[in-house]
Amino acid sequence: MNLIFTRIIRRFGEGKRKTPFPGDPILVPDEPYDSKIQESQLSPMPQIDAKLINHLERLSLVRFDSEQAVANLRSSIRVAKRLELVDVEGVEPMHTVWEDQECPTFEDVEEDPLPIEEVFRNASLRFDDFFVTPPGNLPLESKERFDLNVINEWDTIGKPVAPEVKLTRMTERKK
């Protein structure tokens, strides 16, 4: 393991920062930026309930398995709400994060379609002329796993971490 790590350091350099093009200035700060936006200017935080958590789990395929995970979601929403205050009047949308870098697009070229049997050759399951995919993120528990009142008050309390996790079958197995 140390040999691999040593080779990686020799190849890429220890502590060297990478940029897309040599000579580009590094625009990412070393320390996090402390926002000057007043919390009173932000729109109110949405109340997170069990229905919303289940909906987000289904959409994102991410399992909120602890109160800390839901508290992190609230923290992310709070950061995203700051973007509502950004004035973007007259600013053209960017296609890439690098202003001076081209984002080439190609013309659509019509090609001969593949035969259906060749398309489905690698499909493990097939129904008529459709691929059968595995089901998405299905909720495992229908009961509420979290104390939602505490979570919805968590960021107003000002604590750096969420309250203690309630014991469930999932957390008991992890211990």
From Swiss-Prot:
- Describe the reaction catalysed, as an equation: L-glutamyl-tRNA(Gln) + L-glutamine + ATP + H2O = L-glutaminyl-tRNA(Gln) + L-glutamate + ADP + phosphate + H(+)
Provide the GO MF annotations for this entry: ATP binding; glutaminyl-tRNA synthase (glutamine-hydrolyzing) activity
Q: Which InterPro entries match?
A: Asp/Glu-ADT_sf_sub_c, GatC
Q: Is the ATP-binding keyword given for this protein?
A: yes
Q: Which GO terms describe its cellular component?
A: glutamyl-tRNA(Gln) amidotransferase complex; mitochondrion
Q: What is its EC number?
A: 6.3.5.-
State the source organism's domain of life. Eukaryota
> Per the UniProt entry, what are the Gene Ontology biological process annotations, in alphabetical order?
glutaminyl-tRNAGln biosynthesis via transamidation; mitochondrial translation; regulation of translational fidelity
Primary enzyme class: ligase
Q: Where in the cell is it found?
A: Mitochondrion
What are the UniProt keywords, alphabetically?
ATP-binding, Ligase, Mitochondrion, Nucleotide-binding, Protein biosynthesis
Subunit-structure text: Subunit of the heterotrimeric GatCAB amidotransferase (AdT) complex, composed of A, B and C subunits.
Q: Do you know which HAMAP family this protein is assigned to?
A: GatC
Other remarks on this protein: This protein may be expected to contain an N-terminal transit peptide but none has been predicted.
Q: What does this protein do?
A: Allows the formation of correctly charged Gln-tRNA(Gln) through the transamidation of misacylated Glu-tRNA(Gln) in the mitochondria. The reaction takes place in the presence of glutamine and ATP through an activated gamma-phospho-Glu-tRNA(Gln).
Q: What family does the Swiss-Prot or TrEMBL record give for this protein?
A: Belongs to the GatC family.
Name of the protein: Glutamyl-tRNA(Gln) amidotransferase subunit C, mitochondrial
Protein species of origin = Caenorhabditis elegans
